[in-house]
């Protein structure tokens, strides 16, 4: 059952056994995630890196926020998919993200709903907790079409 009481609290545990092996991330009853450095920093390609987890969080946050906003507006969504990209580069203060882009494709039931869905995507981005926590600002590249 959803609650609107605030504040909400979230907890993640990390266990590292030393060496250059990955770590295990756990959060209550959720599946364990094996993570570590990305290949660019001598990690393994099979590990979930902090960078990939951040983009996953951004993608999932926008989708769930859009579902909530569209649901409250009474707009049925037929299909949603997204792909997130980040550019990591040297900055005056060290390594940092210099670009974050979310490519989103949405399908609605009719052409009459396309502009409404675009508006609701923009609204969802403005309410997305993860997007609001990131620097630089997230660029939304949205494509909405009717089925």
Regions found by a protein language model. Name each.
Residues 1-56, 67-147:
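Extended beta-strand/beta-hairpin segments
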Residues 64:
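Active-site-adjacent loop/helix segments that line or gate small-molecule/cofactor pockets in enzymes
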